[in-house]
Amino acid sequence: MKLAILGAGCYRTHAASGITNFSRACEVAEMVGKPEIAMTHSTITMGAELKELAGVDEVVVADPVFDNQFTVIDDFAYEDVIEAHKEDPEKIMPQIREKVNEVAKELPKPPEGAIHFTHPEDLGFEITTDDREAVADADFIMTWFPKGDMQPGIIDKFIDDIKPGAIVTHACTIPTTKFYKIFEEKHGDLVTKPETLNVTSYHPGAVPEMKGQVYIAEGYASEEAINTLFELGQKARGNAYRLPAELLGPVCDMCSALTAITYAGILSYRDSVTQVLGAPAGFAQMMAKESLEQITALMEKVGIDKMEEHLDPGALLGTADSMNFGASADILPTVFEILEKRKK
């Protein structure tokens, strides 16, 4: 199998967050006995996993930065990073972040510059600056593109070089629905004829070097392609999840924090209403829908930054407390504390 990686990534944004580390990369490095994997990041980590753990025999990385300032920081011994991560990553991560931030001050941003700690060629990857060369005959095309409206222009340059039946994935910078739309608008028959192009995601849900997980979007690829990618993801990333394409953003992007709170609330509310009160599931669903729709409508009407002006958080303290039983009691006490702090 040939894997084409379009976009090598840059560590500066990972360092800037102040919370990331190399836990997954170190784990893989130890598993396969290749210390140089320990400080890989972004697509390079995922490429190394696919090569070493899933048996992908050819990996090509394309990025214009290879003709510019692709910078490898070699101040840190891989073995030292691995040992630190066995105990507490923060024993070494502050020094790494400090060095990255220092280098980033003088180095241009991608595609003119990028910060890495391992060169892809040292992992047995081929490199190129030509996306067309990379995707030629590739079975799996993993994109790692910038945000915004730049993706259609990038895709337009190589779309005619993708072989029929190939799997093309995106990560965190675009929804699957919009990613598919680009291919549909550029080359409709490519995604609608029998030998279809399989558009999906290989979304890590976090920085790849930190967590071993991947989220695969269903709806725009064949079942066979999804199964193939799911099996690769399980072997390479350790944990793989399939989900409808429209749920990928809510589950994987920054709004996942809200999704987690909302979903836990729905499930707890449902169990309290149906199991303790004995209400029909349809009634519980009707009430849940009313809650979600009206709070969403309020946010859209007045703006997320002005919601408290129109609904005092304290208004819920004297009503929701009557539902503080069953599964809801696992959540509501903490919620009440938050509402109390925010009430007018």
Curated annotation (Swiss-Prot):
One of its GO terms (molecular function) is N5,N10-methenyltetrahydromethanopterin hydrogenase activity. It catalyses: 5,10-methenyl-5,6,7,8-tetrahydromethanopterin + H2 = 5,10-methylenetetrahydromethanopterin + H(+). Its EC number is 1.12.98.2. SUPFAM superfamilies: 6-phosphogluconate dehydrogenase C-terminal domain-like (SSF48179), NAD(P)-binding Rossmann-fold domains (SSF51735). InterPro entries: 6-PGluconate_DH-like_C_sf, HMD, HMD_C, HMD_C_sf, HMD_N, METHMP_Hmd, NAD(P)-bd_dom_sf. One of its GO terms (biological process) is one-carbon metabolic process. It comes from the Archaea. It holds the Pfam family HMD_N. It is an enzyme of class 1 (oxidoreductase). Keywords: Methanogenesis, One-carbon metabolism, Oxidoreductase. Pathway: One-carbon metabolism; methanogenesis from CO(2); 5,10-methylene-5,6,7,8-tetrahydromethanopterin from 5,10-methenyl-5,6,7,8-tetrahydromethanopterin (hydrogen route): step 1/1. HAMAP family: HMD. Belongs to the HMD family. Catalyzes the reversible reduction of methenyl-H(4)MPT(+) to methylene-H(4)MPT. This is 5,10-methenyltetrahydromethanopterin hydrogenase. It comes from Methanothermobacter thermautotrophicus (strain ATCC 29096 / DSM 1053 / JCM 10044 / NBRC 100330 / Delta H) (Methanobacterium thermoautotrophicum).
